Amino acid sequence: MTQLSSNDVPSMGRRQFMNLLTFGTATGVALGALYPVANYFMPLRAGGGGGGTSAKDELGNPVTKTGWLASHQAGDRSLVQGLKGDPTYLIVNSEGEIGEFGLNAICTHLGCVVPWDSGANKFICPCHGSQYDTNGKVVRGPAPLSLALAHVDVDDDAVLVKQWSETDFRTNENPWWA
């Protein structure tokens, strides 16, 4: 075997070593601090491989079909956390089952949350008086558009909310929110 001469072996001085160590430590700390920030802006999708977002109740717990139907009667419209965290109405239909669609509760006028008025049997916006029928179709302005629709599916008792991209059955037009 041949020996390398001292001219062929690179040497690292003390200053160069300390600079490398300082840079490595600072980089590690910066990446460690950025990890939670990145997770905040890119959260994992809930719901699994079938797509959709798990509907969550007011405490942030996933909504189950059996639990929801045990506490809600036919005709009930109650809020859950749906797509993108928006308030979304789950509808219990006349057969006592969770409906196939949900309604985004954000008013299309100025973005207020629109409550369900069971006495008037419609959604009435408290901000400027816009009114929507039982299916979320605007019946009185100033809101220019109907409430956005979302698919509601039940997968193994879990209630999932999915993006609605088909024709809006209330207006027979392409959805404005897609």
Swiss-Prot record:
Presence of the UniProt keyword ATP-binding in the record: no
Protein role: Component of the cytochrome b6-f complex, which mediates electron transfer between photosystem II (PSII) and photosystem I (PSI), cyclic electron flow around PSI, and state transitions.
Cofactor (UniProt): [2Fe-2S] cluster
Top-level taxon of origin: Bacteria
Annotated localization: Cellular thylakoid membrane
EC number per UniProt: 7.1.1.6
The species this protein was found in: Prochlorococcus marinus subsp. pastoris (strain CCMP1986 / NIES-2087 / MED4)
Entry protein name: Cytochrome b6-f complex iron-sulfur subunit
Keywords of the record: 2Fe-2S, Disulfide bond, Electron transport, Iron, Iron-sulfur, Membrane, Metal-binding, Thylakoid, Translocase, Transmembrane, Transmembrane helix, Transport
Record's cofactor remark: Binds 1 [2Fe-2S] cluster per subunit.
Membership in a protein family: Belongs to the Rieske iron-sulfur protein family.
Residue numbers binding [2Fe-2S] cluster: C107, H109, C125, H128
